[in-house]
């Protein structure tokens, strides 16, 4: 199943124009808060965008790790009678 | 060959969709693992992190995206605890797909950066570069949405 998907992608990717690549790169650029406007050639800025994207994803993964940690601690120590617990209960059951 | 200018959509659902999926995941965890279970703390953290990624993949559209499909498949394999064998299989898959991808190479400096990105995006190993970028744009939007949801939850629970 995965091999047929890959061959499908190989044939459809030849139809993706360079305009769409540029469009995707600009979309990526917009999604990343740190990246600054780059006046250099398209190739250089494309590689820089991809690099920044890698860093951004690594940061998000790290944040998710830290938040999972904190969330675990908070959920363990939550007092069942507190207002927070009531809010969570209503959100889950509602 | 002139291409049909298909609109590449990278829109993601609203934050409350992610929040709802995540809370449901958490409540399922609670049902399976009552508070006084003998689970080690690090296992609990791992379960919550996994719930975060799985609920994010579901909120983002489940099987409609390559990255979410790959993430959910990986999570299902983890549950069956056949991780070692499936990891070896995946490495072979990457070798085959990189041979196919060579026919669609962009500039080497771009491909080099794309390779690093492939290791970070679920299912990236089998994607051609342009598809990879489309999936990545969607993935990072969803990931940042999920992080926001978790931050809100932490903030809400931290108030005294």
From Swiss-Prot, chain A:
UniProt record, GO biological process: gibberellic acid mediated signaling pathway; photomorphogenesis; regulation of growth; regulation of timing of transition from vegetative to reproductive phase
GO molecular function: DNA-binding transcription factor activity; protein dimerization activity
Protein purpose: Atypical and probable non DNA-binding bHLH transcription factor that integrates multiple signaling pathways to regulate cell elongation and plant development. Regulates light responses by binding and inhibiting the activity of the bHLH transcription factor HFR1, a critical regulator of light signaling and shade avoidance. May have a regulatory role in various aspects of gibberellin-dependent growth and development.
Protein name: Transcription factor PRE2
Record bears the keyword Acetylation: no
Protein family (similarity comment): Belongs to the bHLH protein family.
Description of how the protein assembles with itself and partners: Interacts with HFR1.
Tissue: Expressed in roots, leaves, stems and flowers.
Organism this protein belongs to: Arabidopsis thaliana
Residue ranges of domain bHLH in the record: 5-60
Misc. comment: Plants over-expressing PRE2 show long hypocotyls, pale green and slightly narrow leaves, elongated petioles and early flowering. They are not sensitive to the gibberellin inhibitor paclobutrazol during seed germination.
Record GO cellular component, one term: nucleus
Heme among keywords: no
Induction of its expression: Not induced by exogenous gibberellin.
């Amino acid at each position: 199943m995965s091999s047929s998907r890959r061959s499908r992608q190989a044939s459809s990717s030849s139809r993706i124009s360079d305009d769409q690549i540029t469009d995707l790169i600009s979309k990526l650029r917009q999604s990343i808060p740190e990246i600054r406007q780059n006046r250099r050639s398209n190739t250089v800025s494309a590689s820089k965008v991809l690099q920044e994207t890698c860093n951004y994803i690594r940061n998000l993964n790290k944040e998710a790790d830290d938040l999972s940690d904190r969330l675990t601690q908070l959920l363990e120590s939550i007092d069942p009678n507190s207002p927070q617990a009531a809010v969570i209960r209503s959100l889950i059951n509602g | 060959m002139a291409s049909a200018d298909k609109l590449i959509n990278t829109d993601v659902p609203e934050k409350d969709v992610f929040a709802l999926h995540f809370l449901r995941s958490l409540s399922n965890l609670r049902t399976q693992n009552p508070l006084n279970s003998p689970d080690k703390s690090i296992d609990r953290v791992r379960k919550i992190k996994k719930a975060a990624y799985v609920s994010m993949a579901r909120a983002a559209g489940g099987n409609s995206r390559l990255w979410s499909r790959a993430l959910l498949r990986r999570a299902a394999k983890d549950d069956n605890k056949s991780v070692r064998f499936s990891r070896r299989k995946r490495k072979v898959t990457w070798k085959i797909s990189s041979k196919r991808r060579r026919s669609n190479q962009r500039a080497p400096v771009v491909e080099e950066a794309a390779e690093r990105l492939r290791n970070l995006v679920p299912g990236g190993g089998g994607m051609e570069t342009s598809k990879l970028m489309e999936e990545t744009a969607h993935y990072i939007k969803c990931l940042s949405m999920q992080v926001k949801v978790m931050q809100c939850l932490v903030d809400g629970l931290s108030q005294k």
